Regions:
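Amphipathic protein-protein interaction modules
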Residues: 88, 96-102
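Short S/T/G/P-rich N-terminal loop/turn motif that feeds into the first structured element of a domain
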Residues: 1-77, 83-93, 107-127
C-alpha cells in the first residue's frame, strides 16, 4: 500500500544526551521487535503498517553545517503511518499490552521528547 493524504500517523522527536543513547537504542530495538511481531504489511487484519522508520543523528550546532560541531546530544525520530484510525487504535491496544515496553516509552517521552504528532493526518504525500 502507498501512503496518501488522510492516512494517520505518529512522529515523535527526541533529544537524548549522548551518555543516555544506549537506553534509547535498547528501547528502539524492543519496539522494532514488537512492530515486526504484531503488525502486518498487507491483508485486512489491523494493525496494517504502511511505513515504520526510526532516524538517528548527532545533533549539530547548525543542522545545515555538519562542520559546526555537535551539541553532545543525539536526535531520534520515530515515524509510523497507518491507513486510518483503526490501525492506530489496534497499535495502541497492542502496545499497551506490553506493559514494560509501554512504561519505558512513557518515561523516555517524558524525559527526552521535544515534539510529538500523535494520530495526525498525512497532509502531503507522493500519490
Amino acid at each position: 500500500m502507498s501512503i496518501k493524504r488522510g492516512n494517520i500517523g505518529f512522529h515523535v522527536s527526541f533529544v537524548v544526551p549522548n551518555d543516555a543513547t544506549e537506553r534509547m537504542d535498547q528501547f528502539i530495538a524492543t519496539h522494532e521487535q514488537f512492530m515486526r511481531e504484531s503488525h502486518h504489511l498487507s491483508g485486512d487484519q489491523e494493525p496494517i503498517i504502511l511505513s515504520y522508520s526510526v532516524f538517528k543523528s548527532p545533533e549539530f550546532n547548525n543542522p545545515f553545517d555538519p562542520n559546526s560541531g555537535e551539541t553532545g546530544n543525539t536526535l531520534y525520530g520515530l515515524t509510523e503511518i497507518y491507513s486510518g484510525p483503526e490501525g492506530v487504535q489496534a497499535h495502541m491496544t497492542l502496545g499497551q499490552q506490553r506493559e514494560a515496553m509501554f512504561a519505558e516509552l512513557v518515561d523516555l517521552t517524558n524525559t527526552y521528547c521535544v515534539a510529538g504528532l500523535l494520530g495526525a493526518p498525512v497532509i502531503a504525500a507522493m500519490e
